[in-house]
Amino acid sequence: MHNLVILGASGSIGQSTLKVLRHNPGRWQVLALTAARSVEAMLRDCLEFSPRFAVMVDEAAASELAAQLKTHGSATRVMAGPAALCEVAAHPDAHSVMAAIVGAAGLAPTMAAVRAGKRILLANKEALVMSGAFFMEAVREHGAELLPIDSEHNAIFQCLPEAIQRQPGFCDLAGAGISKILLTGSGGPFRYTDIGELAHVTPAQAIAHPNWSMGAKISVDSATMINKGLEYIEARWLFNAAPEQIQVVIHPQSVIHSMVQYKDGSVLAQLGNPDMCTPIAHALAYPARVESGVEPLDFFSVGEFSFIRPDYERYPCLQLAMHACQQGQAATTALNAANEEAVAAFLAERIGFMDIARVNEATMLALGGTAAGSLDDLIALDGAARARAHNLIEELS
């Protein structure tokens, strides 16, 4: 039986992963589930999937979960704290680790799984945005296997030659006959909104994505299109791509999840209904194919595909991320940290929608040139960028 650890089990990706498992009973054994503090969801899922371990980052939540599991006669062992995340991610009995903790908090346990040589199902894009070169070097050094979960990167992965699939991050795209990666995005809920109205966007409007069901933070990131910018940075590291080998294309229907253009003029694309269960099922079973529970694509109901060039006045965060990628690792780390803080402030109605870009840009300009020669340096830079962003948010509040 293939043992699976799900980091971030109560989140959108974690719940979609459990959906795929339900469609494939007996194929995977859940070794561990983790969450921050969602006791109710973890209790339900622990009783259904009977993991050996359950980790709650919050100690009070861990105590509550342990007490409730005990009343149900569950044998699941409850652990607490960030160190426990790393412990289960690197557990000797774990075969695959779904890295689905949102944000910088997911870096340490994901890196622990990498250093233990696990098969990493990477849904935490911040791990690469924050620590790209260090992360990929650890993958190579420890013989870990990396499979992308983001729908776009999973689509690109599926469109690449098998030889490149076996060595992502260290491949030669041009040598394999590839001229360009085409990274698609819906453009979010405001692609047709008058630019002058964007300053008045509310959190409720920003999280109402037209195509995908996602968590609040990633929904706001989609609305600003920094999500696509972070994916641009992620693609740079995942596929060893130069900035000029990646092009962002707005595709409102969210049916073509990304494409790869070859030198002979061919373009390979991966299509499907916009449901994260598809890339999750692909990565879980790779190189096999299993049921995902997603309805087959009905081309007649889709009707047509359209493509739009990004407007950087509408999406300044996208342009910031592309510039950060060209500038280097410190810039992408600072941008990611600032964005997490800015989005949290926007969701708390402390700053406006367009203030997110202002906080991001000012933080990146201040700290993007910082020297960072180690992972510890990047973690320190992440903290400094958050402090800088906090100060900017206070000024805007």
Swiss-Prot record:
Query: Reaction(s) catalyzed by this protein?
Result: 2-C-methyl-D-erythritol 4-phosphate + NADP(+) = 1-deoxy-D-xylulose 5-phosphate + NADPH + H(+)
Cofactor(s) for this protein? Mg(2+); Mn(2+)
Give the EC number(s) listed in the UniProt record.
1.1.1.267
The residues that hold 1-deoxy-D-xylulose 5-phosphate are K125, S151, E152, S186, H209, S222, N227, K228, E231
Q: Which residues bind Mn(2+) per the record? A: D150, E152, E231
Q: Which UniProt keywords apply?
A: Isoprene biosynthesis, Manganese, Metal-binding, NADP, Oxidoreductase
User: What's any GO biological process attached to this entry?
Assistant: isopentenyl diphosphate biosynthetic process, methylerythritol 4-phosphate pathway involved in terpenoid biosynthetic process
Q: Name one GO molecular function term.
A: 1-deoxy-D-xylulose-5-phosphate reductoisomerase activity
According to its UniProt entry, the function of this protein is described as:
Catalyzes the NADPH-dependent rearrangement and reduction of 1-deoxy-D-xylulose-5-phosphate (DXP) to 2-C-methyl-D-erythritol 4-phosphate (MEP).
Q: What is this protein called?
A: 1-deoxy-D-xylulose 5-phosphate reductoisomerase
Q: Which organism is it from?
A: Aeromonas hydrophila subsp. hydrophila (strain ATCC 7966 / DSM 30187 / BCRC 13018 / CCUG 14551 / JCM 1027 / KCTC 2358 / NCIMB 9240 / NCTC 8049)
